[in-house]
Structure formats: C-alpha cells, structure tokens
Amino acid sequence: MTLIRGSRPRIKVLLAALVLTAGVGGTALVAPSPGTVAEQPAQDQRPAQDQQPSAAPKQSPAARAPKAASYPIGGYFVFASPSSSRNTQKLSEIKTAGADTVITFGTILAPATLATLPKECVIDGVNCAKAAAGNLEVNRYFTYSDGSVWSSQAVKCPQDRRITSQGKAFLVLVLPAQGTGCTSTNGKYDVVVAGGGAAGGMDPAASLALAATKLGMKFYAGLPLPVKRTDTAYLPDVSYQGTLTLFTERFLQYQAATNNVKGLAGFYHSTEMPVTDGHTFDPILDLYRMQNQAIHRILPTRGAIVSPYLDARVSAFSISLTEARKGIRRIAQTASGLVLNIAIQDGMGTGKGGAFQSNEANSAVDRYAESIVGKGSWSSKYVAPIRDYFLAAAAGISGTGAVLWANLEGMAPATASNPCGDSLRGQSSKARIDRQLQQLSNAQKIISFMWDSYYTCVGTGVPLKAQVESGIATPIITDATFDASTGQVRITGFNLSGGNAQVKWTTKAGQRLEKTVKPTSTNTAYGVQSGMNPELEMILVNVGKTTLAAGRYYTVNVTNQWGAENDAFYSQRVYTAQSSRDAKG
C-alpha cells in the first residue's frame, strides 16, 4: 500500500445473497466445515483449522440485547495536523462514521550530508549538526523531517541540542556510532536533525493523541523507518540499522515522557512486506522484531500494528494461500511480548486483490480492476478471492498471540470516471467498500487506508465519508447456510438484527419459492463468541421443511430494524452433493 496522494449512497438497495445449493443431502452449505470437499482454487491447501464455525453459538440474554447500528470499519489512517482543532474535528468525523481508531505513518530516518541538512537549522550562524557535534568525529548525518516540535525532554546527551532558528524548531541528536548511551566505543558519532515544525506550534502526534484521549479513541503513531535500498527497492537499507535502533529508542523514550496519554494505544510499522514466508524479506522481519522489543521495553502497555500486503494477481507476485498462512505466522513471531495486530491489506484499491464470490469466478472483473490486470474473469486474473486469504491467515496466526486485523483499501484503481483530487488512485464507493467488507468477517478489526483523502476527496460523486455516514445501518451479509431438511437458514453479517429476511430458492421439483420471515433467533454476540469480528451478528430464520435443487443458487436479502436493506452482492462457493452429505453427517 503506497501512500499517494461514486455514486450517491443508498440505504435501501435490493441485493441478493446468492448461494449455490447442495444436492442429495438437502443442506446448502456456505461456510466450510471439517470434512467438506469444495471446489477450491488450485493453490488452496487450507487445513481444517481455517474453517468458520458451523454451529450457532448458544445465546445469552446479553447476546439478544439490541445494539446501535455501526459500520464495520473501526479505524482509519490519517495525516496528523499541528492544529488541535483540525485534529479534533477530523477524529470527531471519524467517530461519527463508527470508528474508534486512527493511525499515522512514520517518518524516514534518511542519510544526509552537511550540504543537504535543513538550511534553516543553524546555531550562531553555523550548521546546527556541525555545531552540535563540535570536535567529535562524525560518522554519518541523518534527517528525520517529521515537522514536529520536539520539547527539551528529548535532550538526553551532552551534545544534544534543541534550537529555534528562522521560525522553526529543530532537535539535534548526537548518537554513538557504536555502543549505547551517550558515549561511542569507537569515538565516532551519528548526528540526526529532527523536527522542523513551526516554533511555538503544537506537535502533530501529541495533538492527535490528546484529541483521541478526549474523544475516547485510540491512536497508533508511526514508527521511524529506514530508506529503501537503491538496488532492491522493496527491501530496507540496513547499513545503518544500529543508528535506527538507537533513534527508535530515543523516539519511544520521548513518547513515554511527553505523550503517555490514554489515547496513545501503540505504534505503527510503516515498512511493508508481502504476506509470504520467503526469506528474502527477513530484513523487514528483523526490523519489526527490533522495534517491537523496544516498544515492549519502554512502553510495555502499548501494542503495535503492521500491515503486510496481498498480491493475488496471477500475472504478478502471486502469493499462494499456503504462503499467506505461513507468512503471517512469521510476522506474528516478531511480536516480542507485545500485542501485535497484523492488518493485511486487501488489495482492492491497488488491483492486487479481488473481492469476488464463487458464482462470479467466471464473470469479468470490474472496470477498476480491469485498469490494473486487464480484461478477463476474476478467476483468471486472481489466484483466489480475498476471503480465502483471510481464512488462511486466520489459520496461520492461530496460537501466536498476535491478532488478525484487515486493512481495507478505501480507494479504487484510478480511471477517467473516478478522480479523487490530485491522487494517483481513484475514488471508491460505499457499495464497493461493502463488497470488500463481506470478505473480511474473520478479521477481529477492520481499519482502512485512508481517511485523507480517499474518504474526503470530491470526485465524481458524493464524498465517501458522507456515503458511509448516511449508510451506516446497511446490513452486510457475510455468510449463509440453508438446511432444507428443517427449513432453517442461518445468516451472519453486520447490522442484521431486528427486521426480516427474504429467502428465494428452487426445489428439486423445479418450483421457485419465496418467503419473507422474521428471525426465530438473533445473536448479536456471534462475532465475539466465534473469535471473529466482534460486530458480527447471526440470525436464524425458518421457511419450513423443503428441498433444494442441485446446482442452483438460493438468494437471501435482509431488511434490518432500521429499515435498511443489504446493498452488496453476496454469494458463496460451489459445493457438490457429496460434500453436502459429508458435512451434514
């Protein structure tokens, strides 16, 4: 996910949940269960642990209690502003959209020379880095241009300086090139010039943390990161790993001293890698491990987020489901004692992933994906749908202590029809976002890249944030099963409760039937009980004993207690008659 800079929302849109019915056994299966043999992509080697629960959890009084409508996206990437009022306004809007978490990207600790250091940073007319180092032997110079206003509490060593020059505030750190503390064991030092914010201004990260605290929200601050290698652009430059380690510790010590507020929930790793087990990316895993250890040592109650990316394109890197399962486990093993939230990017905004259902496998990709992968069907362009990758990831992360999140890409590949300001990506729509959400139900939290500016830009239609706010109560169906022998239909998703469900199906005799019925049971705690997204609900409806024709789809629509109908296309995998009998037994 590279940091680069519609249609009118509808509450009531008819959209079907299509599920291919099973044959002889009489039970239409949607979610896999142990022993089920389904049509799978060639690389799907998912073990039984990947499967979602098939039995309805036992209800409790609390599970039946009604709850307010909420959109499944629980957090957004944002830009921090030095203006406290702007940060508060932005977080208030995000909270109105149903989220409680914001994340910022980190700043690069970049190698520099005396000539490339900020011209405004001077002490008595002398370059501030040169003046701070004095007679010490300088190994390398660096910049950390975060635009912040570091306070005097960042000054720890005798040569460190906090200065105001030409209307800007800078911090100069003199770090040992070898060893720890303030004194180098080889007599050489690295000098870092940080900050550059307006003198007398507010530190953006501190302002955002205070706003989050005031609003009862969570803020994850971006960690320092290295530059990329010049020969291999997808790997970090580890030639100054020691300097980055020392600077990370000083950065975290400063956060502990000045920004240790309730709203600061943890930190974000901005260096990215694919969800794969390839050892090529070991330097990135080493970086995660180093910074996680530092967080846990200095701020032991804080967690971290890392957001690896998918690439399911057949014509590209093509991460397999097995690689994703093993890859997330390797990332989880870098946690080093803290709570590590692994938010996999779904790839829909960059065209690297496909949110499609089984009955769409042979259908043409949408125009946004087509702009990246070309014309063709979903199954010919992508190894597997996003949902399969998250099932594999859930199996891989199991038992590690890390938490599976999802990073929903809130933009779309750019075309002539969906400009988003001056961004290189295009504006998406809530209907497309809802399709993505259907694939992510087993992630315990869903965050999205990014509020600024993909949710706020004025493109060809209504800004995405307005679409989300007006459609916050929309039901989103994530799964359904139909047991024809009892007539019970089990539906899971978001914002399902309090209304009714419409079921359409074809019997073995070829008769088309339709019923609209109220739920016989509602479990608003289904997600919590199942270890999936805590906002997930489950409803049971009964249409009476019947039969289901083999090879035919049944449809399910939900109207909830707010009168809203699902507005995202839904279907599931193709199952054989034999698989139905096996699973039923």
PLM regions and their residue ranges:
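C-terminal region of N-terminal signal peptides and the immediate post-cleavage residues
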Residues: 5-6, 12-14, 24-64, 585
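N-terminal carbohydrate-binding accessory modules
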Residues: 39, 61-98
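Aromatic-lined carbohydrate-binding surfaces of glycoside hydrolases
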Residues: 81-87, 94-279, 310-318, 346-357, ...
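Substrate-binding cleft of secreted/luminal carbohydrate-active enzymes
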Residues: 83, 90, 94-114, 144, ...
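Active-site neighborhood of glycoside hydrolase catalytic domains
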Residues: 249-250, 279-313, 325-326, 335-338, ...
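Short, compositionally biased P/S/T/A/G/V-rich stretches that sit at domain boundaries
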Residues: 308-312, 356-357, 464-485, 578-585
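A short glycine/threonine-centered beta-strand motif
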Residues: 488-497
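Ser/Thr/Pro-rich low-complexity tracts
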Residues: 497-507, 513-585
